[in-house]
């Protein structure tokens, strides 16, 4: 194909959910279409959650243990009052920092912020990394005697997310 096509397209999660809903419907109505438009289910979250679940060791305690419990029963609906949605997004934010932060920090803080601001690229790359389990981004270059695995990075990201949420909202998870 001789023409340039930008890589800046939206994550397909929203259209995947809309298509899923439309394919399951018979006899459309205004109310049904409203429910499709107001649907807050994230196929991206549903796709990523099983990878997060696999990192639970059973040795977690406190809010970290509760976080895994919330994530295990979460249906991927991004309700404003959902503790699991908050934990998921805090985990994803920390995952991005833990995957890319060590390399991009070498260029300066502005580079990390600029890259993480490109949500479309970041989500697409995370999907690729999770599908293959491989990427040079996974290894933390600041730990020369250890090559991190994707599960280690995910586990660290969940733990970092809980620390971040406790610092922001306190240790009582019901206040999150």
What are these language model-derived features?
Residues 37-176:
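Acidic, low-complexity N-terminal propeptides/linkers enriched in Ser/Thr/Asp/Gly that mediate export
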Residues 1-66:
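Structured mid-domain segments that build the active-site/substrate or prosthetic-cofactor binding neighborhood
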